[in-house]
């Protein structure tokens, strides 16, 4: 209805002949698709070699343009409090000892959350690259991943970060 109303308005406003409406594209039947194999990210990284660094590395530092990076940090002492990732680009799911504890997002301006990491605990931060900024003043801020220090209660978490690149540019080996 809106299409025809706008078209009729245009026909009154232009001096040339408006072309005929194109024929409708036929709808086709798509057969049922069965997805019978799955693999979770934690299983995928179990067999991968991590890149290690004192601080989290960006996607660009890891020579990765798309997909996800899993940032992992082992703690030999318990730590709890407000975790802040001021330089998150773009979206992260946070796990402690394999259990999802929250989400952070540049889009919704959520860059902090409470964490409680027990003795010998593991913090996993799965960061998704949601695409590149390609216009405007923020075009120069196009680094992806964790781009600034991770802090808990204001203390920078350094040493022994492991990064697992998951570009999702090919099917994972699920054998």
Description of each model-found segment:
Residues 1-174:
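Carbohydrate-binding surfaces of carbohydrate-active enzymes
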């Amino acid at each position: 209805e809106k299409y025809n109303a706008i078209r009729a308005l245009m026909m009154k406003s232009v001096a040339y002949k408006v072309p005929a409406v194109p024929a409708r594209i036929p709808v086709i039947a798509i057969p049922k698709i069965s997805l019978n194999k799955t693999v979770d990210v934690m299983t995928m990284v179990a067999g991968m070699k991590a890149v290690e660094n004192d601080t989290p590395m960006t996607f660009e530092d890891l020579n990765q343009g798309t997909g996800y990076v899993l940032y992992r940090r082992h703690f030999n002492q318990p730590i709890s409090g407000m975790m802040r990732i001021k330089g998150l680009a773009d979206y992260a799911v946070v796990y402690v000892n394999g259990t999802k504890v929250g989400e952070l997002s540049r889009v919704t301006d959520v860059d902090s959350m409470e964490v409680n990491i027990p003795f010998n605990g593991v913090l996993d931060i799965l960061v998704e690259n949601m695409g590149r900024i390609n216009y405007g003043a923020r075009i120069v801020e196009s680094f992806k991943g964790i781009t600034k220090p991770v802090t808990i209660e204001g203390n920078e978490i350094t040493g022994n970060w492991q990064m697992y690149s998951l570009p999702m540019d090919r099917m994972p080996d699920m054998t």
